[in-house]
């Protein structure tokens, strides 16, 4: 079986490769990476017609590979993928969809912590829309650790972790469950030893959903 993944950063690639190897080792991964997508979203603060056009192109390319599922890795371009996935002839999945479903099942007050401003709205909207589909009422609070991803990309992992952990602690005090909007925050989980509320990240939940969707 085959899954085509559309990435906006190489940062996520190794983690997802490891998760696929662990959870669905029989699945072939094909990766499409365009790091200009995320930069364009960050620059404009929202998706643009050019981003939508490129995402459509990548889904078309993915279709030629005859995959069993097309996987969107980046929350910031989720709205573009929602448009592009309509032309897919196979199953599709956004990395944060399973996480949003789990968050809604765990509580009515949900904190969304993001390290990229352009991800805050799409991630929050996804939680709200998921709750609506499931017939639940939720209150979503947003927490932006502005610039933290840039700090991580520059190599200062400790500073990135410190900033994000402080924001997670704040979100924990005000919510039933905390959602981490960037998959790049997954490495922080082992450091959250004094956090008692559920803290959810998307990569593992998404790959577990891939397994379910493919019937493996």
Where on the chain are the PLM-derived regions?
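Non-catalytic structural scaffold of enzyme domains
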Residues: 1-216
